[in-house]
Each structure stands twice: as C-alpha cells, then as structure tokens.
C-alpha cells in the first residue's frame, strides 16, 4: 500500500490537505500520515525511520527552514524516496517577481491560523449573546450595539465577528429598559443605531407581511409605537453618551466600517 507522509515544520495542515487531495484521485487505498513540527535534523531522521517502515512511500513537504528541508531531500534521495516540496516552487517564483528574499518563517502560517480562530471565537460570541438577556458578555465585548428591533443589529454583529471583533447587541424596548451594566462599560465601544421612522415602519410592515396570518396594522409597525420607541432609544443613547449611527440608507458594510475606524481596528 502507498503511504503519503505529510511533513511540516508547523502544524502540517497544508501538507496534509495536499496529500489528501492527491490520495482522493485514486480508487486504491492510499494512507496519509501527518508528521508535524519537523524542525531539526534529528526530526528528519525520525521521518526517515517512519518512511522505512512503509511498503511504498511519497513525502509531501511544506518545510520552510532551508537546512532542514535540504536535509530531508538528501536523506530521501539516498533511500530513493520521492519528495514533493509544495511551497518551494511558489516561494521561488514569488521571490523573483518581488525581487526580495523570503523570510523563511515557519510560524507565518500559524499567524493566519490565529486570525481564523479569533474570527470563529468572535462569531460564537455574537451568536451566544444575540438579543440575549444574558449581559455577562458586555465586559468582554469589543463593541456593544444598541438599537430598536429591525435596525440590523444582528447582521452587523455577525459582519463584525467575521473581522474578529466580539460584538454584542442589546435591543431597546420601552417596557424592558437597558441593563445597568451598560453604564459601567467604556462608552467608546457602545454604538447606537438610529433610523428614520418612516423607513422603520416600512421595514417592520414588510417583516410582518411575511407572516400571512399577522396583519401589518398591529402595534409593532404602528406609527405611534415606532415614534415612542425612537424617543425612548434617543433618550437612552443620550444618557449613555455613545456614538450614534444613522442606518436608514446605509449598508451594513458601511456601518461596520465606521465602527471599525472608531475602535481603531485598522491600527491593531
């Protein structure tokens, strides 16, 4: 049986994906074995010991460190084992075009992984505290959105989460009020979403029309109710002293850009 060794001086995800993609092209059984953190000449010897135990073997490598990569290639050639250096050709071509030398930093990919996991964490945070009565997340949030129903709080939270920003949204309703905790956090991370009353009425009526048995004349979309809510929201935002953003004719991306600039996202 053929074995493909996915060898890397980092976690080995890239090498493993390449090996799995190659193996999937054959009906015959191909075993893929990931070997991460090959960072020294001694580690290379361990790889070769594993290779020697295989009936038939190919090595797919994403090792960046030059001396380790060359040592692996040399040892494999001595055993007549094929080595595919996945990143080498791409790095060489890019180096020529950019007219600069690569850093050969094995941890560079890990930095990208950290950004990815930060994004996932922010998304989980946004979902956990979406329109929630659990306000424990306020102190851990990067951004706190407050606004009436149908002012795009949830999609805005998710958009920010995709940037790795932990956002929580607090719905404003006259009957409920706001949690005391919101007055205890830094007001610079609180953003009040405002909207034109006619536009809000239109959005709410359209929302209700999606539910065939619910008339759009109910209080939720009524003029008096909307004006009452807007007045309540305005008083709360003034009391907090937070930045307000009119979302009437503004795309979610544009609103997010304003927030990201205010919290210094591009400077992090």
Curated annotation (Swiss-Prot):
Q: Which reaction does it catalyse?
A: N(tele)-phospho-L-histidyl/L-threonyl-[pyruvate, phosphate dikinase] + ADP = N(tele)-phospho-L-histidyl/O-phospho-L-threonyl-[pyruvate, phosphate dikinase] + AMP + H(+); N(tele)-phospho-L-histidyl/O-phospho-L-threonyl-[pyruvate, phosphate dikinase] + phosphate + H(+) = N(tele)-phospho-L-histidyl/L-threonyl-[pyruvate, phosphate dikinase] + diphosphate
Query: Which Pfam families did the record assign?
Result: Kinase-PPPase
Q: Which UniProt keywords apply?
A: Kinase, Nucleotide-binding, Serine/threonine-protein kinase, Transferase
Please name the source species.
Clostridium beijerinckii (strain ATCC 51743 / NCIMB 8052) (Clostridium acetobutylicum)
Q: What is this protein called?
A: Putative pyruvate, phosphate dikinase regulatory protein
Give the InterPro entries listed for this entry. Kinase-pyrophosphorylase, PPDK_reg
Say yes or no: keyword Nucleotide-binding present. yes
Q: Which residues bind ADP?
A: 147-154
- What are the recorded GO MF terms, alphabetically? ADP binding; ATP binding; phosphotransferase activity, phosphate group as acceptor; protein serine/threonine kinase activity
Task: Specify whether Metal-binding is a keyword of the entry.
Answer: no
What does this protein do, in the record's words? Bifunctional serine/threonine kinase and phosphorylase involved in the regulation of the pyruvate, phosphate dikinase (PPDK) by catalyzing its phosphorylation/dephosphorylation.
**Protein family per UniProt:** Belongs to the pyruvate, phosphate/water dikinase regulatory protein family. PDRP subfamily.
Q: What class of enzyme is it?
A: transferase
Q: Domain of life of the organism in this record?
A: Bacteria
The record's EC number reads 2.7.11.32, 2.7.4.27
